Each structure stands twice: as C-alpha cells, then as structure tokens.
A protein has these predicted regions:
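Universal eukaryotic N-terminal targeting presequences
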Residues: 1-2, 330
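C-terminal accessory extensions appended to soluble enzyme cores
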Residues: 240, 244, 254-257, 267-330
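Chitinase-like catalytic core of GlcNAc-active glycosidases
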Residues: 2-240, 250-253, 262-286, 290-295
Length: 330
C-alpha cells in the first residue's frame, strides 16, 4: 500500500523557510534509513482574486525562494515518494472562486492546471475549509481526472467528524454523498483527527468511521505533529498503543498523516524528521508493543455515533506559518 510496504505515511510541508528565511530541508525524510514516507504534500496553493495571482503561501510558485524546495521535491519523486500539492486550507477563497459559473471556473482553474503541469505533481489534495457545493467539488474532481489521467492522485482532507456527520463539517458538501458519486476517483481522505474534530488517542473514532461504511484503506488518520500546530496532539506512548491496536485489527489500515513537518516532535525544528521516524516504527512493527502508562489500566468505551455529545466544536484556528521569514509583510 505505502512506500516500502507500510501503510501510507503522509507528511504535509507548508513552512518551507524559518523566520530568518533559511530553507527547511526535507532531505532527511528521503535519506534517513529509519524513515519511510510514502507521500509529501506541499502546501498551500491559493487561488486569489487575480486569476493570474496564484500563490504558494505568500509568493508565486515560481518565486526564487522556492527553487531549493522544488528541487528537493524532485529528489523525493526520484526516490519513489509521491509529491502532491495542497489546494486551500485555512485561507478562504480558492474554492469559492472554483464554485462559480463555468466561465469563471475556467478562468481560475487554468493557472492551477498550469502549475500542476509545470511542477510535475503526482496529485492534488483538496483541503476544502470553506462552503462549496457538491456539484462544484465534483466538477473540479472530474476536470482534474480528465486533464491529468488515471494515475493522478486526488485526495481530500475533511475533518474526521465530517465522515460521521455531515453537519460537523467545514466543506459545505456531504462527504458520504461525494464518496458515493465519485469515490472511484478519490485515492483517499486525509481525515483531520485533531482541533476538536477528532480523537486519535484511541482507535474508537477511527473504528466508528469504519462502522459508518468507510473503507479503511481510504481513511488516513490525520495527526498534528506537535501541540504547537493545533489541539489534539497525542503523546507518542499513547499514539503508539492506539496505532498498534488499529493495525492489529485492521490489516488494510490506510495510514497516518502529519501536519506539519518543520516543527514536528520529538525533534522540533532542530530534527523535524524524527516524527516520521517514530511513525515508520509504529506502522512497520510486526510484534505487539506493550505500553504502560503510570496508574493506567485498560479502558473499554462504547460510543453511540448518533448520540449528541454537546455543542458542535469550533473550527480550528488558522495556523501562523513562517513561509517568508518576513513576518511584517503578512
């Protein structure tokens, strides 16, 4: 399923430079023997009001500051890692512009098409965190498939709660309806199990998604790589136990994704690749691991997916990335 036979290990890479403008290299994800990343997702592509003003974070994708990043991503591809772009995210507007009449869609889609083509991306991750119609997302998926062919990867990044209840959703459209109508065109879902929209500390919510009818090979468990990137970070001891339970009971587990690379624990900004190293170990283990937490004992929980659990959680806060090293310009 994934690189070197493990379930998918997907890493998002948005903060490409530190606040001083120094490159944050992803080469350790490629070269270190204990790391087996299957997919890298470069974020975030924004469709702005000016149709020709497409940006990767705060600059045009062809800006010289990204030259080394694109070069490293080509090395990743040459090493067998698939590289996708991420469209959208917390910054609004991209999908609103693509959800308009055909002529307007075409005007805004063409620069996106050109960028994907120019950079040789293996796929596009659709992170829809603003209202969009079901017809609009289907039109976009159909166009990407028609333009880039059958091997092009199309993924989506719903909050995990949206896979259980269409009302707990940032995207506007119903993901179950989308899966029924275009599931064959969607490689998998990078489901966000964090920021109040999911819980990765136990297998329960993931298993609830499967009970709802989602195929495990299409649901990648999304994690924050550090508490600094959002609420819901799970300590490694607890996460390792949860992932081992999932792997043992679900042989075709879709894998994990991490948001995001540059400050991942345990190495933080000095050694951000260590998160992927830990995940490789968790996903690649064949022996049962035993995790004992101080004062802990086995807990059995029964959750009713139809039961109301209080108020709807708030949308995650926007993450302040340092893509420029020029914070006063943002």
């Amino acid at each position: 399923m994934g690189h070197n036979g493990v379930p998918r290990l997907v890493v998002y890479h948005q903060t490409t430079h530190d606040p001083s403008g120094n490159l944050i290299s992803i080469l350790p994800l490629i070269t270190r023997p204990g790391v087996s990343v299957s997919h890298l997702i470069i974020a975030a592509i924004h469709i702005n009001e000016d149709p020709d003003g497409l940006t990767l974070n705060d600059h045009p994708p062809a800006h010289p500051r990204f030259a080394s990043t694109w070069a490293e991503l080509r090395v990743a591809q040459a090493s067998g890692i698939k590289v996708l772009g991420m469209l959208g995210g917390a910054a609004k507007g991209s999908y609103t512009r693509l959800d308009k009449a055909e002529a307007t869609f075409e005007t805004y889609y063409q620069p996106l098409y050109a960028m994907i083509k120019e950079r040789g991306l293996d796929g596009l991750d659709l992170d829809v965190e603003e209202p969009m119609s079901l017809a609009g997302i289907i039109r976009l998926i159909d166009r990407l498939r028609a333009d880039f062919g059958p091997v092009f990867l199309i993924t989506l990044a719903p909050v995990a709660a949206a896979l259980l209840d269409s009302r707990r959703n940032l995207s506007g459209f119903d993901y179950e309806a989308l899966e029924v109508m275009r599931g064959k065109q969607i490689a998998w879902y990078n489901a966000q199990f964090y920021c109040g929209w999911g819980d990765a500390s136990t297998p329960v919510m993931y298993q609830m998604c499967l009970a709802r009818g989602w195929m495990p090979e299409k649901v990648v468990m999304g994690l924050v790589t550090t508490p600094a990137n959002g609420a819901g970070w799970v300590p490694f001891e607890l996460l390792g136990s949860s992932l081992q339970l999932i792997k043992r009971s679900i042989p075709n587990f879709g894998g994990v994704m991490g948001w995001e690379y540059f400050n991942s624990k345990p190495g933080d900004t000095a050694r951000p690749w260590e998160w992927a190293e830990r995940m490789t170990g968790f996903l690649d283990r064949t022996k049962q691991i035993s995790v004992e937490l101080p004062g802990s004992k086995p807990v059995q929980a029964e959750l009713d997916p139809d039961k109301e659990e209080g108020a709807e959680p708030e949308a995650p806060n926007a993450f302040d990335y340092h893509s420029d090293g020029l914070e006063d310009e943002q």
